[in-house]
Amino acid sequence: MGIQGGSVLFGLLLVLAVFCHSGHSLQCYNCPNPTTDCKTAINCSSGFDTCLIARAGLQVYNQCWKFANCNYNDISTLLKESELRYFCCKKDLCNFNEQLESGGTSLSEKTVVLLVTPLLAAAWCLHP
């Protein structure tokens, strides 16, 4: 590669470095104590890839969470609540009260699509 090719490659790498940033951290509403109207937003720490909102009676928990732990057993154990509703999501500031009020579930829409698509594909392939 000549000098001109090296300059073009360097320019492309520079443009990619400027416009592509890695390490975007998810923003979630996070209140250390249960509250009914959490408005405190934080950038989640590394390893926390999901926002959680959980309601146990009148207590509402908003925080960063690990998607791998987004299930009833882990949430109820870590929050020390035996009866709760919860919603996990992976978009910035998606863990607000209306998610639970509108019938939020434990799985995001994308997760359901990712789970159902292979099953439909398998059924299609097996269909005579």
Swiss-Prot record:
Disulfide feature: C28-C51, C31-C38, C44-C64, C70-C88, C89-C94
Primary localization: membrane
Entry annotated with the keyword Lipoprotein: yes
Alphabetized Gene3D superfamilies for the sequence: CD59
Location(s), subcellular: Cell membrane; Secreted
Lipid addition sites, GPI-anchor amidated serine: S102
Gene Ontology molecular functions: complement binding
Alphabetical keyword list: Cell membrane, Disulfide bond, Glycoprotein, GPI-anchor, Lipoprotein, Membrane, Secreted, Signal
Membrane association type: Lipid-anchor; GPI-anchor
Glycosylation sites: N43
Single GO cellular component term: plasma membrane
One GO term of the biological process aspect: negative regulation of activation of membrane attack complex
Domain UPAR/Ly6 per the UniProt entry, residue ranges: 26-108
UniProt modification remark: N- and O-glycosylated.
Propeptide segments, given as residue ranges: 103-128
Signal peptide: 1-25
Record function comment: Potent inhibitor of the complement membrane attack complex (MAC) action, which protects self-cells from damage during complement activation. Acts by binding to the beta-haipins of C8 (C8A and C8B) components of the assembling MAC, forming an intermolecular beta-sheet that prevents incorporation of the multiple copies of C9 required for complete formation of the osmolytic pore.
Subunit structure of this chain's protein: Interacts with T-cell surface antigen CD2.
Name of the protein: CD59 glycoprotein
